[in-house]
Amino acid sequence: MKHMSIRAEEISALIKQQIENYQSEIEVSDVGTVIQVGDGIARAHGLDNVMAGELVEFSNGVMGLAQNLEENNVGIIILGPYTEIREGDEVRRTGRIMQVPVGKELIGRVVNPLGQPVDGLGPINTTNTRPIESPAPGVMDRKSVHEPLQTGIKAIDALVPIGRGQRELIIGDRQTGKTAVALDTIINQKDEDMICIYVAIGQKESTVRNVVETLRKHGALEYTIVVTASASQPAPLLYLAPYAGVTMGEEFMYNGKHVLVVYDDLSKQAAAYRELSLLLRRPPGREAYPGDVFYLHSRLLERAAKLSDAKGGGSLTALPFIETQAGDVSAYIPTNVISITDGQIFLQSDLFFSGVRPAIDAGTSVSRVGGSAQIKAMSKVSGTLRLDLASYRELEAFAQFGSDLDKATQAKLNRGARTVEVLKQGLHKPLRVEKQVIILYALTRGFLDDIPVVDITRFEEEFHAWLDSNATDLLEEIRTTKKLADDDKFAAAINGFKKVFVASE
């Protein structure tokens, strides 16, 4: 075996080469220390360069959102269980602001405000995300509301019409049918090429389950996303839920689609935000809400819009809910949201308990922009409806005191009683707009004046079934032209049914 000589110069050259090629990868991350934790809030020291609204990560993997940037510490709201976080734990910056997954993969699913599925149907396969806080469309990016959003509820489509891109507040006490109005509207969007997002804020888990089952039963879950932050969730998730919902909707809006977002309800979001603000030691204002509670709702609802054609012509319609206490609409949060929205639908508990359902108060409900979105046929037949109802309510009060009424007053009372009956509607029975037009035409033109009040509901149900088999051409004409057909056609259809209708004894 030959003896191999090792030269010192070769070894030193190799070592020098290795040293020259050596690259040390140093990872620099901003790390802080938790100095206080409790009630879903943590304070951390050392995160000097953190951004407002930046996501931070605790050592146990729970995420947080930097909110209060103070001189010597940062107030963080914790987006998950905070009981595992201890004083002295490490917290590090992520360099990202909060984002949620978006896209058509979410349709038909139930998710939490972080976009994580909670329906047990496996993971959601989408890589697209959008920041949860984004600016609302600018003035030049918008277009005035001109397309109708048919709710399928006669009292709304006739008296307080809603257009695509509008913000219409639904306000009333608890147990007055607010959620039912929203669900009927979602169910009525079938075949309308509309994507619906139902955001449940602070609801009971059982209530959310019922909502999901109702949507599934009526085939509405195929075009609906449910975002839920139930009453058992920490306050930060209740605060973030509406923003998560609108962010998911914006993805479709900016792609030229039409979206309906229901926030059920914003009173609970405001209460959650008040809780967070007080725990972060922000100064309280009226009713202990922080000074920026108006901005909390305005920046959310301003993201609803009808986009200009240059931006794709998509729309996002918002139906925020506010729960009042004993009908007090002059409280802080109700007045704030009334001033932000383009109209409101008042639901009165007195009407609800007297059997008028949906319990819409026609006198105080308004739609500030929806009138221009109403189809011509509907605006023609519903023109006198509000006045008829208002004069009926007024005369009804006087009629209780006197029995001797002249014929004109008696006629108004009779027409008013029939109007109230026609505007009643069963739960989850939305009505197509062409059928609404025909029954309202019959009402306002006096065709129902000789039908007993007790028979009005039955007359309407049987009339709709009769139309489906005997007057499909008339329904199709209203659906396609969106205008009133010839008066003779209407009269022939209505009188044709009246001949076969049998009034009760």
From Swiss-Prot:
Enzyme Commission identifier(s): 7.1.2.2
Annotated stretches, region: Disordered: 118-138
Organism whose genome encodes this protein: Bacillus cereus (strain ATCC 14579 / DSM 31 / CCUG 7414 / JCM 2152 / NBRC 15305 / NCIMB 9373 / NCTC 2599 / NRRL B-3711)
Subcellular location: Cell membrane
Keywords, sorted A to Z: ATP synthesis, ATP-binding, Cell membrane, CF(1), Hydrogen ion transport, Ion transport, Membrane, Nucleotide-binding, Translocase, Transport
GO BP annotations, alphabetical order: proton motive force-driven ATP synthesis
Membrane topology: Peripheral membrane protein
Cross-referenced PANTHER family: ATP SYNTHASE SUBUNIT ALPHA, MITOCHONDRIAL
Molecular function terms from GO: ADP binding; ATP binding; proton-transporting ATP synthase activity, rotational mechanism
GO CC, alphabetical: plasma membrane; proton-transporting ATP synthase complex
Site (Required for activity): 365
Broad enzyme group: translocase
Subunit structure: F-type ATPases have 2 components, CF(1) - the catalytic core - and CF(0) - the membrane proton channel. CF(1) has five subunits: alpha(3), beta(3), gamma(1), delta(1), epsilon(1). CF(0) has three main subunits: a(1), b(2) and c(9-12). The alpha and beta chains form an alternating ring which encloses part of the gamma chain. CF(1) is attached to CF(0) by a central stalk formed by the gamma and epsilon chains, while a peripheral stalk is formed by the delta and b chains.
InterPro entries noted in UniProt: ATP_synth_asu-like_sf (IPR023366), ATP_synth_asu_C (IPR000793), ATP_synth_asu_C_sf (IPR038376), ATP_synth_F1_a_nt-bd_dom (IPR033732), ATP_synth_F1_asu (IPR005294), ATPase_a/bsu_AS (IPR020003), ATPase_F1/V1/A1_a/bsu_N (IPR004100), ATPase_F1/V1/A1_a/bsu_N_sf (IPR036121)
Designated name of the protein: ATP synthase subunit alpha
Reaction(s) catalysed (UniProt annotation): ATP + H2O + 4 H(+)(in) = ADP + phosphate + 5 H(+)(out)
Short name of any one Pfam family annotated for the protein: ATP-synt_ab_N
Main location class: membrane
Task of the protein: Produces ATP from ADP in the presence of a proton gradient across the membrane. The alpha chain is a regulatory subunit.
Family statement drawn from the similarity comment of this UniProt entry: Belongs to the ATPase alpha/beta chains family.
Residues annotated for ATP binding in this entry: 172-179
